[in-house]
Amino acid sequence: MTNSNLRTENHFDYVKISIASPQRIMDWGQRTLPNGQVVGEVTKPETINYRTLKPEMDGLFCEKIFGPSKDWECHCGKYKRVRHRGIVCERCGVEVTESRVRRHRMGYIKLAAPVSHVWYLKGIPSYVAILLDIPLRDVEQIVYFNCYVVLDPGDHKELKYKQLLTEDEWLEIEDEIYAEDSTIENEPFVGIGAEALKQLLEDLDLNQIAEELREEITQSKGQKRAKLIKRIRVIDNFIATNAKPEWMVLDAIPVIPPDLRPMVQLDGGRFATSDLNDLYRRVINRNNRLARLQEILAPEIIVRNEKRMLQEAVDALIDNGRRGRTVVGANNRALKSLSDIIEGKQGRFRQNLLGKRVDYSGRSVIVVGPKLKMHQCGLPKEMAIELFQPFVIHRLIRQNIVNNIKAAKKLIQKADDEVMQVLQEVIEGHPILLNRAPTLHRLGIQAFEPKLVGGRAIQLHPLVCPAFNADFDGDQMAVHVPLALESQTEARMLMLASNNILSPATGEPIVTPSQDMVLGSYYLTALQPNYQKPDFGDNKSTFASLEDVIFAFEDKRLSLHEWVWVRFNGEVEDEDEMSKPQKIEELEDGSRLEMWKLRRDRFDSQNNLISRFVLTTVGRVVMNYTIIDSVSKT
């Protein structure tokens, strides 16, 4: 743990997520002021005063609970300036501190009746239903006040523990119990709502149930066995994390810090607010109304209805739309609940925590780089100068080209030849990492040697495309620069594209020509029917070597699919190789000319090959020449 500039940094080994107990939820938000007053409970649905524009006390933006909205200034204005740091105002009870505490200080709402947590009730699988071994439909009937559940059957012969009863059935049993001739001494006890659910969960002895289930598993098969295993897994998790099942029923709900659900004033005096504030307001209003009804001893049916509405309000706050009607705001738009903020691609985890922008990284469209080696990639100069700027500045100063960082930055902005020369020296032997989302296996991020290129697109060797599952139809890739020597060494030794030939999943080669390469090879060697085949000996279409054809093509005297006669003394695979020549002509010098469909072979009197001309297309010559050239170099 380090302490510098009054900021404390904590280094953690891991983050553990588990169910919070009601006491822990209250501890998150509760603070004791120096005068002994305990603050933290949000009791009013108000946000800010529309005349003074200051937060209302005990409301959702209360300064006493969450901290001052202005740095070093209390609510009433008695204390201002940093010299009063840490003082709690006697008049308004606000601590004089920085306003940024409103980003992490929490509050809580003490509920007038317990409510079930919708994640554990309506999640897949429903942990409440699994633990209680009751169908989810029946659990919902209990929670949403449609059915009673027997908590204690007493002396009643027809009732069983956890049995569901409708309103009419319970009324009949009540009449039976309280009849004059009733023989029932130990009265049965029933419950309804989340309170009954909490009682059922409290009655569970997890260790005993786990033992019984393990014995039962040995004697069961098929579907029943799978169900028992599912239940014991949940129970074992509860035991391992020291969590109690009744914590799945909430007695208090946390109120997240106000700066994470802000309220901002727009032009014209109107306010824009986070959806969470509306959802919290619904919960507080219903909670306060329920508390008032309980105080005045309102009829049971009214109290029960209010409890159900409170349950629905908390459900909407935690996960709007998971159960029942979705709560909508203006324009019939569904309000964003806590779950909506957390989950999904645009959620807090994937968007803001895992998807953070990183220093020394860039992003651009990829295009094919056919002249690159497999371990190379083309990095745009504009991107390279930005990514390698600290290295370039260091070298410029070391070579006495400039004296300070400011002068170096000015020189870099001009991007003259001197800077480009230094940049070339810097990137020499400095690997970079290329990543294409989604990174589904380890080959989704590989190291390459950068080569400076013009334009604004990253050039990629087509052979590495299958590993990245990339194509050149607009895909984007991210560039990362490894800074430390260890990471550069690791990138070069382990992550270089030429070291990752085989797939880690199957062990088969992953560097195979695919997509653009296959299409390019096909286009290069394809035969176009609209091009006429020239006669043998036609000066315009006869060439002495493959190089001559390439030069003529580069000089734009030939098109890619044009037929040519080219002298080639190597082996030729021909479709009519097994048949006889179409014509054999004896020449004056004693040699003979064999005329095949796609070649002309000339032999001397001893049957030695003097020359061979092949009828082919320019594209096929380019293909052959490239392959022969690359093979001869290795």
UniProtKB/Swiss-Prot annotation:
Q: Which UniProt keywords apply?
A: DNA-directed RNA polymerase, Magnesium, Metal-binding, Nucleotidyltransferase, Transcription, Transferase, Zinc
Tell me which Pfam families the record gives.
RNA_pol_Rpb1_1 (PF04997), RNA_pol_Rpb1_2 (PF00623), RNA_pol_Rpb1_3 (PF04983)
Task: Answer yes or no on keyword Zinc.
Answer: yes
| EC category name | transferase
What GO CC terms are in its UniProt record?
DNA-directed RNA polymerase complex
Its Gene Ontology molecular function terms?
Answer: DNA binding; DNA-directed RNA polymerase activity; magnesium ion binding; zinc ion binding
Please, which domain of life does this record's source organism belong to?
Bacteria
Q: Where does Zn(2+) bind?
A: C74, C76, C89, C92
InterPro entries, per the entry:
DNA-dir_RpoC1_gamma, DNA-dir_RpoC_beta_prime, RNA_pol_asu, RNA_pol_N, RNA_pol_Rpb1_1, RNA_pol_Rpb1_3, RNA_pol_Rpb1_3_sf, RNA_pol_Rpb1_clamp_domain
Q: How does it assemble?
A: In cyanobacteria the RNAP catalytic core is composed of 2 alpha, 1 beta, 1 beta', 1 gamma and 1 omega subunit. When a sigma factor is associated with the core the holoenzyme is formed, which can initiate transcription.
Which family, according to UniProt? Belongs to the RNA polymerase beta' chain family. RpoC1 subfamily.
Give the matching HAMAP family. RNApol_bact_RpoC1
Role summary: DNA-dependent RNA polymerase catalyzes the transcription of DNA into RNA using the four ribonucleoside triphosphates as substrates.
Query: What is the official name of this protein in its record?
Result: DNA-directed RNA polymerase subunit gamma
Q: Which organism does this record belong to?
A: Prochlorococcus marinus (strain MIT 9312)
Its taxonomic placement starts with: Bacteria, Bacillati, Cyanobacteriota, Cyanophyceae, Synechococcales
